[in-house]
């Protein structure tokens, strides 16, 4: 009887080669933190060490959960079946809808850098668990002729935050497993020496970094969470952070992280995950904060816009809602989709909230100071924002918020118009 075998390269094909880039990968990890009931998600980029650290204060993982869920491909990580228990929840918080369902988050890490150290501590369980530590070198999964079962992923448990000596011991286990593959001639000498050099150069001390970085992510005394230490980080992260110095457009990181939650529309839900990104450009402890909430649209600015369109499209594509012109005249509108013939739409019903700012100051009711500020933000961040359960949905796995090219069309054809658009509470089926 024959059976399917899975080459290790399948993970590379499903992960790194399917993710649009580092910002998209980070977005997937934030969604995983959301699903783990985290309140905070911090990103620290230490340029001098070429190290990216991502930390959340969520529920974390036990050793069994890490091995049976995180290291298992497919949707079982988020869904229950007869042979596995439901993912843990934090009963002290409102239940959160699951954002990630296909295991993309764990594979997306390979799009950020070639090696990752995972440190996780489970909390709110029936008993106190030790800290779980694992190390993965993604270069191994690029090698031809190796099956998944040939690759060893060392998983250790510690009662303390692991230090440099602990990590060196884990790295040596990986090198020894590669040496065995080399002796079996499953990998050649050149690949073995190359990957061995990469593993040896991985210099991370989680204990020391926990003291050095911003506090609030302790993994002792009943606290929990998951932390990723990724190094080396791919060079594209620099352009993702800095963008084009000659352009006013938002950088790729800003595009991805600004507006992750809906904070624009009145009465929006309170964001459940507070996201921070610190860029340490020197070795003196100083950093640049990449995410400044004041740089994005505020509720007050959204309401200042000249015109508003708010309502709902039903399952047949009919729009029903309010239209407010220059903040004064309000009209009830019903717009039928004449050519639909009572067929239900594929996306289902959804709500829309659109704010429109006149492209010229003389045509706007907004004062000079506010107009200049809102228009500058519109030029940088304006576009279509789609939210499901108050978390932005990204088209085609990319960070482009203007994927319908609304702003581009407007700039090319009608220079006197600019848009500030927010799409919220989209119920996609």
Q: PLM features: what roles do these ranges have?
A:
Residues 34, 142-429:
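N-terminal assembly/transducer modules of large multi-domain enzymes
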Residues 1-240:
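GHKL (Bergerat-fold) ATPase N-terminal catalytic module, capturing the glycine-rich phosphate-binding loop
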